[in-house]
Amino acid sequence: MLRRHHLDPRKGLGQNFLVDHNTLKKIVGSAEVTAQDHVLEVGAGLGSLTRLLGASAGSVKAVEIDQRLVPVLREVVKGFANIEVLQGDILELDPGRLAGKPGYIVVANIPYYITSAIIRHLLENEIKPARLVLTIQQEVAERICAEPGDLSLLALSVQVYGKPSISGIIPAEAFYPVPKVDSATLRIDMYPQTLFNDKQREQFFRLIHMGFAQKRKMLRNTLAAGLHITGDEAAARLSAAGVDPDRRAQTLNLAEWKTLVNELQDQL
């Protein structure tokens, strides 16, 4: 397809096109798309996945940033009345407004260099999807799915919105051009109810940034520095929340962070 249209993948856009048909079908299966679903596809590329989504979904909004690919994409999906192709940068668009209403499904092949920014943009939108199925670097997917003891800012920033899981590993050879690392299909099932209101969510992110500022240090020390209080005061507040002051940020689960936000809300 690229050769026929005299096009080359753009390194500056992190373009690696998923070309393995079996993998494409597995991604659609992981998304559990039905005829009642509205799908927002990010990074539609050459339309291989777009066509499969269009065959299953009620409607598909396919977003592609590369102006060169849009005419090709429109040609590939021209037989599908339920697919609309849009040219633009998803980071400059409102995903929820594109989808039209809550409960839509996001399917995306995300460039490695802006993975975190795109995930955050999709999760933080006011009009929430039901789930996201993302093709991302395997190592990043594993970090997002980490459990207490190995948690990170990235993992907590996703897990506060939904439950992540890895649906499958995608070998580098499934892409063109072939990247240096393997990828994974990451599925995020959004919680039906948010864990925090808007103010609490801001406090949560402020708190975890404090906790992970020096993640090898004990929480009594990182929170003392972040809240500008003494170590003894920080230890007392942690103990009041049922958290051992000598623990480190990566060992706390989401419920413990929520309890800690409630305990420290007067200082966050």
Residue spans for each PLM region:
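Catalytic cores of RNA-modifying enzymes
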Residues: 1-210, 239, 243, 250, ...
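Conserved PLP-dependent catalytic core of the aminotransferase class-I/II
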Residues: 215
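Short helix-coil junctions and helix-kink-helix linkers
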Residues: 224-226
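Short amphipathic alpha-helix in the helical subdomain of ABC transporter nucleotide-binding domains
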Residues: 231-234
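Ca2+-coordinating acidic residues in Ca2+-binding motifs
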Residues: 256
